Structure formats: C-alpha cells, structure tokens
Amino acid sequence: MRIEEDLKLGFKDVLIRPKRSTLKSRSDVELERQFTFKYSGQTWSGVPIIAANMDTVGTFEMAQALAGFDILTAVHKHYTVEEWAAFINTASADVLKHVMVSTGTSDADFEKTVQILALNPALNFVCIDVANGYSEHFVQFVAKAREAWPTKTICAGNVVTGEMCEEPILSGADIVKVGIGPGSVCTTRVKTGVGYPQLSAVIECADAAHGLGGMIVSDGGCTMPGDVAKAFGGGADFVMLGGMLAGHEESGGSVVEENGEKFMLFYGMSSESAMNRHVGGVAKYRAAEGKTVKLPLRGPVGNTARDILGGLRSACTYVGASRLKELTKRTTFIRVQEQENRIFNSL
C-alpha cells in the first residue's frame, strides 16, 4: 500500500484564465478539426465531440441529428445486425462518416461487429468499450481487432493513468477512452472506491498518448459546456458526452408520466436497469455500478448541441484561440473554490 501525495483535479476544481485575444467575434472560431489516425491511416474532419455509446444516448436517431453539426455518435452495441442494416439503408454517407460502431470484448461481440462492418465500407470507426481497461483480456482484444480491421479507426477504453493509456495504443488503438467513474449516472466510485478525477486523468493520459502518436477522448464528467472546454484545454482530442445529451427526443429512453408531467429514463450501462434490459438481471457475483434517473423532456437535441458549440466558441475567444486546435496550448488553469454565483439556482 502507498499514498500518492499529488493533488488530482476534476473540472469543478479549476477555471480557465482569460488571455489577450484578437478575435472580434465568436463566429471567427473554427471548431472543426482534422485528424489522421496512427494505425488506420484514415483522415477525418469534424467537430471532435462524441455522443456516448449508451442505449439512452447513442441511438441511430441521435446519429442522424448530430451529423448535421459535424458531431460523432458512438452507437450503442445493443442494436441487432438487422437493425443496423435498416439504418444503413436509409442513412446518407455523411451520417455514416459520423458513426462509431460500439462493441464489447466477448467472442459474440466480435462476430457481431464483423457482420455490422461488412454492411457498408463507410463505417470507419470501432469503439471497444469496457468499464475496466486495466485487464489483459481487453488489451488482447484490441490487438485482435486491429489485426481484423487494419483500416478501421479503433477507439478503446476506459483507462485513467498514463502508463495504461499506452497499452491499448501499443496494441493497435488509434484513440483511448479516458474516464473511470465520472459519469452522471455512474456509481463505480462509490461502489468500489476506485476512480480518478477527470481533468487530471485527461492531462496525464493526453501526455502519454500523444507521445506515442495516439489520441484520447475524455469520457464522462462534463455537466455544462464549460467542462467540455476544460477537457479540450486539458489536452483531450475528443470529448464524449452522455448526460448532457440525454433526455432528448433522439435519446431513446423510455418515457414515463408522473402527475401529468413527462420524464425520460436515463441510466448507466452498469446499472440494474441496463442489466435487466440486456442480460436478464444483475449477476449474483456483482453489484450494479450505475443509477437510473428521470429527466424532464428536453426537446430536440439540436438546441443542446448549439448551446455546447456556442459555449466552446466563446471559451476560445476568451483565450485568443481562433481554432479549437489552439485551445490546449492557450489554456492556463487556475485552481478555484467556486465556479459560479448560485444564489438563484433553486428558482
């Protein structure tokens, strides 16, 4: 046993220090980025935000809507091959280039992903998703996926420390997903005592990944557009959002009514709700590590997407970054004990 004395920080612990800017308008900021990935060799351009691969966020409908904003969607792994085929038959090439195919690490997951990718060559992204990216089985699966799909861009996770961020990259991942426990409906930290403050995880993993020519996606912990800006400022190449995109018409959650008001259910993918729906319940040897919440219906996701992108543009103007690519090198974080004046938050 040992204790690390270094303080680790989350998004709530910092603000971005404003700097001199020559920008005249938020409209001068370019949010689109262009990446060429280490192993796949694919070049992609767009806004590097990803809708999370949760079945109450990463839906086909969400992919259709967010493609119009140049945003990616990691479509959840619980759609059947037949449902994928129906979606591909109606989706445009532009939508498909904004889609990531999510998979677990079982043999059945692998075979299903093989079938999905065979449906259309425009599906260029694979998202390998496990809660604990510290297992040897996960790293071996990444290597297997790279061998099977040499031209696909592979995103894999989750990890939170620099040394383990390197492992999936060395095994064939182009992008590593960073985050254990920061999600709004994740209870891993309270059930297990395991986790890592998200901003520090992003900073440390970005340093490790970039040294190997890889990239990272900050997954979880964002509650507002300012957190998205902080994630990019900390070195994230992509930012994945779950709770911020939940509760919309395109989100796919079940709608319930209470006292004449309608709500949409949103739950973590390790919650009892998710396991009851997809695997027949919580196995006797494990505990649920997620919760279910009821969100007031939020309408079309387009309004939220505009708010996020607008906040991101504004953050760039405050530090003089004319392009999102410049935000990291123009970011100085200051530690704080308050984020906002909350006097009217309860009204």
Swiss-Prot record:
Source organism per UniProt: Salmonella choleraesuis (strain SC-B67)
Family: Belongs to the IMPDH/GMPR family. GuaC type 1 subfamily.
Functional note: Catalyzes the irreversible NADPH-dependent deamination of GMP to IMP. It functions in the conversion of nucleobase, nucleoside and nucleotide derivatives of G to A nucleotides, and in maintaining the intracellular balance of A and G nucleotides.
Gene Ontology biological process terms, A to Z: purine nucleotide metabolic process
Entry-linked PROSITE patterns: IMP_DH_GMP_RED
Active-site residues, as the UniProt record annotates them: 186
Catalysed reactions, as listed in the record: IMP + NH4(+) + NADP(+) = GMP + NADPH + 2 H(+)
Binding positions (K(+)): 181, 183
GO cellular component: cytosol; GMP reductase complex
Complex and partners: Homotetramer.
Annotated positions binding NADP(+): 108-131, 216-239
Keywords: Metal-binding, NADP, Oxidoreductase, Potassium
Name of this protein: GMP reductase
Molecular function per GO: GMP reductase activity; metal ion binding
EC numbers, comma separated: 1.7.1.7
Transmembrane intervals: none
